[in-house]
């Protein structure tokens, strides 16, 4: 519970301040549009995974066991893997109650393509009855089809870091559709990101917010990594495991106290996924 609370208050809320400041500008430069998209990617991850962790913690307190809903999605090497790690409960629901009843992948290629597109149309519609969510869902449906039928062998030959970077880029584009309330604004933002709108490459506000939040964004990126798994691969893992018995409770306590302090001193506390 404390870990989820800290994710929400310390990381998601701070990312939210960055996105709100940038979206409040009269216009965005290329650099500003990328900074907003990256900050929002971390905001929605720590926001949703944060209160998912809080729900798991509350369940443990009352003797219930809930499955993990997020499994470090930003280390995914493909979009397919991303959706096995992101919002696992939603993906499981659509797989069990839509994809498999339609025949799943046990049918011919044409029907398999149809099934995937139906699932992702409904996934987009589940988030909201507006064009940006429909396009968001079909965008992922198209990406999954490309990976499944065209890029599977190629991705196996590429270094892991290249696959992770390209997957994060594709996910970042998807979050732009998610961020805006209408499709035209999302498309304009993407045009700015890729230098297709005539916007300036950078601007003083983008530089300011980047410099003042660089350490925080690096911290958010590091917090997205599975450190427990990574540390278990080190030769000194036994020593680290022994130290973890008292270091982890100490870190969690400090994070919780910092979160309480931030809640008391700040009024900014949105819950993004509550609107879905």
How would you name each of these model-derived features?
Residues 1-275:
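Membrane-embedded transmembrane alpha-helical bundles that form the catalytic cores
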């Amino acid at each position: 519970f404390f870990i989820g609370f800290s994710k929400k208050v310390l990381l998601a809320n701070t990312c939210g301040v960055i996105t709100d400041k940038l979206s409040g500008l009269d216009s965005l430069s290329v650099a500003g549009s990328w900074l907003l998209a990256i900050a929002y990617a971390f905001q929605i991850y720590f926001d949703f995974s944060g209160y998912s962790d809080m729900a798991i913690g509350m369940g443990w307190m009352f003797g219930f066991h809930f499955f993990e809903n997020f499994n470090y999605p930003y280390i995914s090497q493909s979009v397919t893997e991303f959706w096995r790690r992101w919002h696992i409960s939603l993906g499981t629901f659509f797989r069990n109650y839509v994809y498999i009843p339609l025949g799943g992948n046990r049918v011919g290629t044409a029907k398999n393509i149809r099934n995937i597109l139906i699932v992702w149309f409904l996934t987009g519609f589940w988030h909201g009855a507006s064009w940006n969510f429909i396009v968001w869902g079909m965008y992922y449906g198209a990406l999954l089809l490309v990976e499944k039928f065209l890029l599977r062998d190629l991705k196996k030959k590429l270094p892991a870091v290249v696959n992770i970077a390209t997957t994060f880029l594709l996910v970042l584009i998807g979050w732009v559709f998610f961020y805006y309330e209408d499709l035209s604004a999302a498309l304009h933002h993407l045009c700015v990101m890729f230098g297709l709108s005539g916007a300036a490459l950078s601007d003083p506000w983008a530089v300011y917010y980047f410099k003042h939040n660089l350490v925080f964004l690096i911290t958010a990126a590091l917090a997205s990594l599975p450190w427990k798994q990574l540390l278990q691969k080190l030769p000194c893992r036994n020593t680290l495991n022994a130290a973890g018995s008292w270091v982890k409770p100490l870190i969690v306590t400090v994070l919780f106290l910092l979160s309480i302090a931030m809640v008391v001193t700040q009024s900014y506390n949105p819950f993004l996924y509550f609107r879905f």
